[in-house]
Regions:
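Alpha-helical transmembrane segments of compact multi-pass small-molecule transporters, enriched
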Residues: 44-49, 101-116, 190-194, 222-226, ...
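Hydrophobic transmembrane alpha-helices of multi-pass small-molecule transport proteins
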Residues: 47-50, 111-114, 124-143, 267-283
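Glycine-/small-residue-enriched transmembrane alpha-helix faces in small-molecule transporters
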Residues: 1-33, 146-182, 189, 215-219, ...
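C-terminal transmembrane-helix exit sites in multi-pass transporters
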Residues: 86, 107-127, 137, 249-269
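Transmembrane alpha-helices of multi-pass small-molecule transport proteins
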Residues: 6-21, 29-81, 131-134, 183-204, ...
Length: 283
């Protein structure tokens, strides 16, 4: 029952957050400026809310210090990169397409979990990865600049998914090594720190209201929380990464209904079905 509730929490939270960000990008920021600063301020809200995790478990670091520092830095670098790339590209990539492309994190996570977390990779999962790429190619029609080349925003969303795969693996290592609360907070706060540094270096500014920041930050916190709870409850990162890919279908439906993203819908539906079939083979 706890696993079922965790999955339901994830599907709701992980869909609401990107849909709201996509709506903001389309309606509140026509120039798509200040995304680094916006992602930083959103993350500040999320990490402040993460202090509530201390009610569940105290902050206590255990394990090899060098490995913990390395994993924490990887979370900071790749997590902040995933945020910046995703937030910058989201105005130009439809919610459903972004969901399919972002799921590149699944094979990345499975491969890294196999290497570093002693979780298994099977030949059928390799086939699933190939099918996923076919699905991504089908939905990418609008973003192709050549036969096998794509516009920069599609590539940015793809790289965001790759970065997310590294982040998830490093974060899972922290949780398994030093506990759920400590591992999660080390990851989230380091990401926030790196985003703050990027914002200072680039002198980035945005025009979103405090209300936009608080709502986006709260939804982002719930999305992040739903993921770490799900991984913690189920216990197998590869399995969770595969099952949660059903979010692709939810995002296409929600994007069409709530955001009016119905252009070339039959092709997108076919591409999403192919992608889901590939992702199912990754479980």
């Amino acid at each position: 029952m706890s696993s079922l509730i965790s999955y339901l929490f994830y599907f709701v939270a992980a869909s609401a957050s990107p849909l709201y960000r996509r709506w903001l990008a389309k309606n509140k920021n026509t120039e798509n400026s200040g995304q680094i600063a916006f992602s930083f301020h959103v993350t500040v809200v999320a990490v402040l809310l993460s202090l509530g995790l201390l009610l569940y478990q105290p902050f206590h670091i255990v394990g090899n210090t060098s490995l913990l520092i390395l994993a924490t830095l990887m979370c900071g670098i790749f997590g902040s990169l995933a945020y910046v790339l995703s937030y910058t590209a989201q105005k130009h990539v439809e919610a459903g397409v972004a969901s399919v492309v972002g799921n590149i994190y699944t094979p990345i996570t499975i491969i890294l979990a196999t290497i570093f977390l002693s979780e298994k990779l099977s030949p059928i999962q390799i086939l699933g990865t190939v099918i996923l790429f076919i699905g991504m190619f089908i939905v990418s029609k609008k973003h192709r600049t050549g036969k096998f080349t794509f516009d920069k925003y599609f590539v940015m969303m793809l790289l965001s998914g790759v970065s997310l795969g590294v982040l998830i693996t490093a974060e899972r290592f922290l949780q398994k090594t030093t506990g759920f609360t400590t591992g999660t907070m080390l990851s989230w706060w380091t990401i926030c720190l790196f985003l703050g540094i990027f914002t200072l270096i680039t002198h980035n500014k945005h025009t979103y209201s405090k209300k936009d920041i608080v709502i986006t930050g709260t939804l982002r916190f719930l999305q992040n929380l739903s993921w770490v709870i799900l991984v913690y409850v189920v216990g197998n990162l590869s399995y969770v990464s595969a099952v949660t890919t059903f979010k692709v279908v939810i995002m296409f439906i929600a994007g069409a209904v709530l955001l009016g993203e119905r252009e070339d819908l039959p092709r997108k539906i076919i591409g999403s079905i192919v992608a889901v079939l590939g992702l199912l083979l990754l479980k």
